[in-house]
Amino acid sequence: MQWYIDKLPALEHVTPILSVCGDDCAVCPRFLARTEEELHETAVFWYNAGWRDHIVSNEEIRCTGCGCRPTCSFMLLPCTREHGVSACRECASFECDKVKDMYIRSDEKKKQCEKACESPEEFLMLYRAFYEKEKNLR
C-alpha cells in the first residue's frame, strides 16, 4: 500500500492506541485510511494478506477502532462487554481460551502478510499493528 508506506516515517513515534485484542490502531491501515483510494488499497491488501476471502467494500474495510462494529473477528469485543471490562487484560479470566485462540489465529496469517507487503519496513509497521498482541496485552 503505497499510501501507507509514504506514512511510515510519521508513524514510527506515534503513541499506541490499543484495541481490545492488543492491536495498535495508531499504526493500522484500516484506522488510518481516509480517502476512497486508500480504503480500496487497504481492502485489496487485506485480501492479499489472507485476512479476507474477497476484496470487501470501502465501507466494510473502514474502521474507527473497537466499537465501530457490533462484533470482531475474534469475538473479544462482545466478551469484554459481557465481563464489564474495556480490554481483555483487565478481565479476571485473562488469558482465557478465546485470547489464546486469538494469538494462534493471528500468528497463522503472519507469513502471508509479510509476502503481501511491498517492503520490509511496511511489514515491520504491520507487525507492530497486529503481531505484538501478547506484549500489548500484558
Language-model regions: role of each:
Residues 1-138:
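Cysteine-centered metal-binding/redox modules
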